[in-house]
Regions:
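Active-site groove signature of glycoside hydrolases
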Residues: 155-158, 195-196, 281-315, 371-373, ...
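Aromatic/acidic polysaccharide-binding cleft in carbohydrate-active enzymes
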Residues: 18, 26-27, 419-511
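Extracellular and organelle-lumenal recognition/adhesion modules and their flexible linkers in secreted
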Residues: 1-198, 202-235, 253, 269, ...
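An active-site-proximal structural segment forming one wall of the substrate-binding cleft
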Residues: 169-189, 236, 243, 263-302, ...
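Noncatalytic carbohydrate-binding groove/subsite architecture in carbohydrate-active enzymes
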Residues: 149-159, 316-441
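Carbohydrate-binding surface patches
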Residues: 507-539, 572-578
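C-terminal beta-strand-rich structural cap/linker in extracellular carbohydrate-active enzymes
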Residues: 558-581
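The substrate-binding groove and active-site-proximal loops of carbohydrate-active enzymes
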Residues: 166-174, 220-236, 254-262, 302-320, ...
């Protein structure tokens, strides 16, 4: 029976609250099909060739060369007499007892046109008359029924241009699903990073200040992985202001990524002034006129993975000079902000990092570090460079991280003392569904982050990402809380404590202990498949909870949260114990 040795007398360091940040990137199913209340894919009809992607259309013409006619400056369609458009999707889901709203923005091209739209069998009909206006908004509400995989239709008698459509729960929160927000609330994120990630290079913050129906869709077709679940486009239904409202609702600190590609110094200065400026400033006044007090965003990421996707800023000198320009301009708007510069540990980009740092001449507060254990999301057992389940069992076994070793021992060898690291993206892999193996990897990774302050100067961390990539699985009208979400929730009991040394005489137990004065809190990860009973040398166990998983694989996702009566941790599972002397 393994003994746990707790070295309270040796002291330690404060467990950082900021280990529990998350990313909310506009990508894949994180927003559309996840956080967003919108149920219609490609609702502004931007994506597609001869027909708009995701829509079955009859008697129509797709207009691609007259974007200024559309209120959102997108592509649109003209439906001839008897023409129709239809979309069927698992995202179209309603529940009995809830109210929903359907909208369409149209322009009759005959003297009158009859427009019928809504859920199949629940459509309402409007007769619209040409009046010289650029568009006519149509709107109605209806009571839901229990429906999964629904169909939305729009048909025309006469002729009309259709610019955009919408279907969502009427009780949305700034365009977001309240049930997903409540599930996020239970995770207790301390900070939220937005809009990416790679999406930052496709997000026009000024565009996102318009009313949602006027926002030009974002084109992500240059990155196959970015908007892959929404036909390489995003309709920008959730913008900067909505993001801040979410942070306030969740009592989470907002963090923002400024694009090296989209922002020069003046644009970045205006952005910071809009977010943090006094109402007497030009852009602070614009924010105040929209009804928002200062956002007080403290941490700003300057660029994201420019070495991979930076276009002209894949050149390290150009990236450094633009970074200097942005930081100087941003701190002109608000000298109190903190900035994080974008670096990498990747073997093929280490010369890039050395060259980049040669040209950085502006003070910064953090260096960014992205930590994915696997490489591609669609492989699991060693293919395409993915870490195997066997390799995962030995991750961080000695508290060592070769990527951060590069930062400490090479890149900043002579100047690491003041460096603070922000692990602003971490997970087993981006774009991957929850599984028992992913949970196990996340548990070891979160332990490492919590214990890495002294060795690697880790001050902050942001999980990538909670919605549909490991924590919360959203399908139709349901939201499932996954094992990693429970891990985050239970690990919160370490907050406010002092991390103290602890060890075991069993090599397969990974331990983290915090001292809270009147009690200790201990989390234990079992690296192997054999259940292990433990003793805690004279401490009374007052609470004992386990996240117990089933088969250890990327294909299995069975787990339970169990109140244990004894200190036993099962294979590839995590045990949490509150201890009293």
């Amino acid at each position: 029976m393994p003994d746990i040795h707790l070295h309270r007398e040796k002291g330690g360091y404060l467990f950082e609250d900021h280990a529990f940040g998350v990313n909310l990137e506009i990508t894949r199913k994180g927003f559309f099909g996840g956080l967003s209340a919108e149920m219609l894919n490609n609702r502004k009809l931007y994506a597609g060739g001869d027909a708009p992607s995701g829509w079955e259309c009859t008697a129509f013409e797709r207009i691609t060369d007259r974007p200024l006619e559309s209120l959102c400056h997108s592509r649109f369609i003209i439906l001839r007499d008897g023409g129709s458009m239809k979309q069927t999707s698992e995202v179209i889901a309603t529940e009995a007892g809830k109210t929903y709203e359907a909208r369409a923005w149209v322009k009759p091209l005959t003297d009158t046109a009859e427009i019928a739209f809504g859920l199949a069998g629940r459509e309402q009909t409007f007769t619209v008359t040409a009046n010289g206006e650029a568009y006519i908004p149509l709107f109605f509400t209806f009571e839901g029924t229990d429906l999964d995989g629904g169909t939305f239709t729009l048909t025309v008698k006469g002729e009309a241009a259709v610019f955009e459509v919408s279907l969502r729960d009427a009780d949305h929160f700034y365009g977001m699903r309240r049930d997903v927000i409540e599930a996020l609330r239970a995770v207790c994120p301390t900070a939220i990073r937005f809009p990416g990630g790679c999406a930052a290079d496709h997000f026009d913050w000024k565009e996102s200040l318009k009313a949602p129906e006027f926002r030009v869709p974002a084109d992500g077709s240059s990155k196959w992985f970015l908007f892959r679940d929404s036909y390489d486009q995003d309709t920008l239904d959730i913008g900067l202001n909505e993001f801040i409202m979410l942070c306030r609702e969740l009592n989470a600190e907002p963090e923002y990524t400024v694009s090296l590609i989209l922002s020069d110094g003046e644009d970045a200065r205006r952005l910071v002034e809009y977010c943090n400026g006094d109402p007497t400033t030009e852009y602070g006044a614009k924010r105040q006129a929209l009804g928002f007090d200062p956002f007080d965003i403290h941490l700003w990421y300057v660029g994201n993975e420019a070495y991979f996707f930076g276009g002209e800023f894949q050149n390290s000198q150009a990236a450094a000079l633009r970074t200097n320009e942005l930081i100087r301009a941003m701190k002109q708007a608000d000298p109190t902000i903190a900035t994080a510069i974008g670096l990498t540990w990747g073997y093929g980009y280490r010369d890039w990092c050395f060259d980049f740092m040669k040209y950085i001449d502006t003070p910064f507060e953090y260096v960014s570090y992205h930590d994915y254990i696997g490489i591609l999301p669609d492989a699991s057992q060693g293919d395409n460079g993915m870490a195997t389940t066997e390799i995962l069992e030995d991750n961080f076994r000695d508290g060592d991280c070769f990527g951060l070793n590069f930062y400490r021992d090479m890149l900043f060898k002579e100047s690491f003392a003041p460096i603070r690291v922000c692990v602003d993206e971490w997970n087993y892999s981006w774009g991957k569904d929850s599984s028992n193996a992913l949970f196990f990897s996340n548990a070891l990774q979160l332990h490492f982050i919590a214990k890495g302050k002294e060795t690697y100067h880790i001050d902050r961390a942001e999980f990538f990402m909670p919605v549909n990539e490991g924590m919360l699985t959203v399908k139709g009208s349901s939201v499932k809380t996954e094992s990693t979400a429970h891990l985050f929730t239970l690990m919160q009991s370490h907050r406010g404590g002092t991390v103290i040394p602890c060890d075991s005489d069993h090599p397969d137990l990974d331990l983290l202990c915090t001292d809270h004065g009147d009690h200790l809190f201990l989390s234990v990860v079992n690296r192997k498949s054999t259940p292990l009973d433990m003793t805690t040398e004279g401490y009374e166990i007052t609470d004992c909870t386990e996240i117990r998983t089933g088969a250890y694989s990327f294909e299995s996702n069975d787990f339970e949260v169990v109140e244990n009566t004894a200190p036993t941790v099962h294979g590839h599972s995590v045990l949490f114990m509150k201890l009293a002397k």
